[in-house]
Design a protein with these regions (language model features):
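Mg2+-dependent prenyl diphosphate-binding active-site environment of isoprenoid biosynthetic enzymes
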Residues: 12-15, 25-28, 39-178
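Outer-membrane beta-barrel proteins and related beta-barrel translocases across Gram-negative bacteria
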Residues: 32-37
Length: 178
């Protein structure tokens, strides 16, 4: 399993990707998100969110989370939800970054980007949904039994992904292009 020092980097990356993909698939199930069968418009949004997240990507960020947890003696499964939350934020950023107003990319991982597969407004809302879902996942008891740890995870992700982190970096990138 992931987190074992006897594994090669490639083996660890593959194992982390599989664990993360399975966790993301469960998190992004329609019933998991809505708690019940969704309305048709929510079904389209969830499909766009799944398009943004599932079916590709190296999953390096989840590997780093899982391997960091292993340094503290935690098994991979105990870090799976935190790793998935980080990947949800990453995929949200890609869904927004691909939009015509930003990088205007039409392909991601060999597939149409969210805005090309659906439309721009759906890509924006899918990205927004992924971002908020990441914080919801971190707040769940299944992520960690200690509420203080969950709050610390939420706070750390908010700082890293906000104006002083990833979003600020994207703004600098776009300003440099003008």
């Amino acid at each position: 399993p992931v987190g074992k020092s006897s594994m090669t980097f490639a083996q660890s990356l593959t194992a982390a990707a599989r664990l993360t993909e399975a966790t993301l698939d469960r998190i992004l199930s329609e019933r998991s998100i809505s708690g019940e069968a969704p309305e048709p418009q929510a079904g389209r949004l969830i499909a766009a969110m799944r398009h943004a997240v599932l079916g590709g990507g190296k999953r390096v960020r989840p590997l780093l989370v899982i391997e960091s947890a292993a340094l503290f003696g935690l098994p991979p499964q105990d870090a799976a939800h935190t790793a998935a939350a980080l990947e949800l934020v990453h995929c949200y950023s890609l869904a927004h970054d691909d939009l015509p107003a930003m990088d205007n990319d039409e392909l991601r991982r060999g597939q149409p980007t969210v805005w090309k597969a659906y439309d721009e407004w759906t890509a924006i809302l899918a990205g927004d949904g992924l971002l908020t879902l990441a914080f919801e996942v971190l707040g769940r008891a299944e992520t960690h039994s200690d509420p203080a740890v969950r709050v610390a995870l939420i706070s750390a992700l908010a700082r890293a992904s906000g104006a002083a982190g990833m979003v600020g970096g994207q703004a600098l990138d776009l300003m440099a292009d003008k």
